[in-house]
Swiss-Prot record:
Database matches in SUPFAM superfamilies: Cystine-knot cytokines
Protein name per UniProt: Transforming growth factor beta-2 proprotein
Alphabetical list of PANTHER family matching this protein: TGF-BETA FAMILY, TRANSFORMING GROWTH FACTOR BETA-2 PROPROTEIN
Lineage: Eukaryota, Metazoa, Chordata, Craniata, Vertebrata
Gene behind the chain: TGFB2
Gene3D superfamilies: 2.60.120.970, Cystine-knot cytokines (2.10.90.10)
Record's keyword terms, sorted: Cleavage on pair of basic residues, Disulfide bond, Extracellular matrix, Glycoprotein, Growth factor, Mitogen, Secreted, Signal
Residues in the signal sequence: 1-20
Length: 435
């Protein structure tokens, strides 16, 4: 009686586990490509937080040079990052996740010895410039895992608007008059009159560049989303030809008098209160001893990337080329740049060495009966993905966005779920025999 109850419980539990396993059914290549294209359509709209493509408007005759400049510099940054990773054979991500990180704080140096603030004569109404000296960390440049820029937004009761969208840019060294002068990093919508708060931005790529090329450290620029007009974040509405000043105020950057009203005693008290809120960088680095202890001669698996897959005819799991033309494949005209991109996808068989546990005929039979569409073998899935930068229009307004995980660069065979299923089956079976 006890054994029957246990068997029923085992079957119910295995049914639940099997049904929860991801399926990996075989598809012909044409069908797979069609599904991949539709998945990309959904991905782009979802990442842009759109429920449907924007309405089609006539394409602008000429995109403003400053917009093209930001798009090109952001795109080039991603390409440089990919090239560095490929050329340097970066350490496996598992090392970065496993080892403890050493954290370093680098404060923004004061503009003047007596007061870390911009005096009225240097006041810039539309943007702020922030610089850091990271030269002390250059010797550990290869150990950098992450860098964050943190700045404290102060309450500004004098603000004329309740909220603004501020953007962070890396200032670039101009090679000539046509080269870009800044590179977009990130943006945030802030409440100008609300209580103060810390704002954090991921600036890993910028700091990595500074550590390797000291002459490129020109700092960051905090500016408005649309300084030549007025941008309303709540409804994304733009009022043209009405310049908007940066109403957000930042500790250690803006002079106390620009956001505080009152006598000298009040101003001094406010300055003291914000003295420990200087803009700073937080650098997270792998400790040197952790790197030295690693075995440098570990055998690495062959990468199933373009370098291997595109020059070999493979039936097994490999990277497959797929170019998406936005107009032809998706019927979209609202993405201005690029016209398309190499999305790629993973497909092919994954040879599997069956263990004695998983080879058990009863295990296979039960697994296939419970979920006939599930694959007992590993699936060919993406391993490395890269972002895509797009320049698109909503109405007549140009926007630049970076979409994460849009380009498949390499593939792998996922670990089979059948092994876990078999272990669960045998553990319950052994429990039943003991009973």
């Amino acid at each position: 009686m006890h054994y029957c109850v246990l068997s029923a419980f085992l079957l119910l539990h295995l049914v639940t586990v099997a049904l929860s396993l991801s399926t990996c059914s075989t598809l012909d290549m044409d069908q797979f490509m069609r599904k991949r294209i539709e998945a990309i359509r959904g991905q782009i709209l979802s990442k842009l937080k759109l429920t449907s493509p924007p309405e089609d408007y006539p394409e602008p005759e000429e995109v403003p040079p400053e917009v093209i400049s930001i798009y090109n510099s952001t795109r080039d940054l991603l390409q440089e990052k990919a090239s560095r990773r490929a050329a340097a054979c970066e350490r496996e991500r598992s090392d970065e996740e496993y080892y403890a990180k050493e954290v370093y704080k680098i404060d923004m140096p004061p503009f003047f010895p007596s007061e870390n603030a911009i005096p009225p004569t240097f006041y810039r109404p539309y943007f702020r410039i922030v610089r850091f000296d990271v030269s002390a960390m250059e010797k550990n440049a290869s150990n950098l895992v992450k860098a964050e820029f943190r700045v404290f937004r102060l309450q500004n009761p004098k603000a004329r608007v309740a909220e603004q969208r501020i953007e962070l840019y890396q200032i670039l060294k101009s090679k000539d008059l046509t080269s870009p002068t800044q590179r977009y990093i990130d943006s945030k919508v802030v409440k100008t009159r609300a209580e103060g708060e810390w704002l954090s931005f991921d600036v890993t790529d910028a700091v990595h560049e500074w550590l390797h090329h000291k002459d490129r450290n020109l700092g960051f620029k905090i500016s408005l989303h649309c300084p030549c007009c007025t941008f309303v974040p709540s409804n994304n509405y733009i009022i043209p030809n009405k310049s908007e000043e940066l109403e957000a105020r930042f500790a250690g950057i803006d002079g106390t008098s620009t956001y505080t009203s009152g006598d000298q005693k009040t101003i001094k008290s406010t300055r003291k209160k914000n003295s420990g809120k200087t803009p700073h960088l937080l650098l997270m680095l792998l400790p040197s001893y952790g790197l030295e202890s690693q075995q440098s001669n570990r055998r690495k698996k062959r990468a199933l990337d373009a370098a291997y897959c595109f020059r070999n005819v493979q039936d097994n799991c490999c990277l497959r080329p797929l170019y998406i033309d936005f107009k032809r494949d998706l019927g979209w005209k609202w993405i201005h740049e690029p016209k398309g991109y190499n999305a790629n996808f993973c497909a092919g068989a994954c040879p599997y060495l069956w263990s004695s546990d998983t080879q058990h005929s009863r295990v296979l039979s039960l697994y296939n009966t419970i979920n006939p569409e599930a694959s007992a073998s590993p699936c060919c899935v993406s391993q490395d993905l890269e972002p895509l930068t797009i320049l698109y229009y909503i109405g007549k307004t140009p926007k630049i966005e970076q979409l994460s995980n849009m380009i498949v660069k390499s593939c792998k065979c996922s670990k089979t779920k059948l092994a876990a299923f078999a272990r669960l089956y045998h553990s319950h079976s052994n429990l039943g025999s003991e009973t």
